[in-house]
Amino acid sequence: MQYASALSRIPSSNSTSASKGPMAIALSATGTGQIQLWQFLLELLADAVNAHCIAWEGSNGEFKLVDPDEVARKWGERKSKPNMNYDKLSRALRYYYDKNIMTKVQGKRYAYKFDFQGLAQACQSAILTNGGNPNGDLSSTVHSLSPYTNQVLPIGVTSRLSTSMSSYHSILSSTSSTSSNQIIPPSTATYWSTPQSSLTYTGMPSSY
């Protein structure tokens, strides 16, 4: 599976032209059937052409499904599920509440909010799953995954997500020096270091 990162070009405060700003990672999978819903939503949000159906609300990670039926249709099209509708989509979104990837904005219809820390962990997991190096520079790792560099994300979303990614990356780096003996339970490590001649097997026919 290929992954694409939305490396944003952030408009400056005094200009409408886009200039490359801090890294905002929004992993989205290309190909058939592998993309996750949170990745797909970030993909839609990263492209202004989708503003008619989904758009950011401010710079704190909040977004609104302007046309929830259209978002559901697009999701169904991507996943080859023609019967997809908003009811099914919203049930899938609720799954992310427990994962701390996003929450429902109370008092606002069709409004949701990404949790930057949870999203950072989800992005990091996606990188590692696809061969990224947790000990290397995160921005370099993400950049190597994708040629896409022209998506636009709100500057607040960019900076907050970048900060969360860096914080989570530091946590991973600090734990990566753990030795294999510490990671593998003692009993398991002892088993694999025991000469086979000393192991006794019972209850299994000799013909196997």
UniProtKB/Swiss-Prot annotation:
Keywords: Activator, DNA-binding, Nucleus, Transcription, Transcription regulation
Any single biological process term in GO: cell differentiation
Pfam family of the protein (one): Ets
InterPro entries xrefs: Ets_dom, ETS_fam, WH-like_DNA-bd_sf, WH_DNA-bd_sf
Tree of life domain: Eukaryota
Cellular component terms (Gene Ontology): nucleus
Residue ranges of the annotated DNA-binding region, renumbered to this chain: 35-115
Function: Transcription factor that plays a role in the differentiation and function of the CO(2)- and O(2)-sensing BAG neurons. The BAG neurons are required for the behavioral avoidance of environmental CO(2) and the sensing of decreased O(2) levels. Promotes the expression of genes that play a role in CO(2)- and O(2)-sensing and in egg-laying in the BAG neurons. Positively regulates the transcription of the receptor-type guanylate cyclase gcy-9, which is a critical component of the CO(2) transduction pathway, in the BAG neurons.
Stated family: Belongs to the ETS family.
Annotated protein name in UniProt: ETS domain-containing transcription factor ets-5
Organism: Caenorhabditis elegans
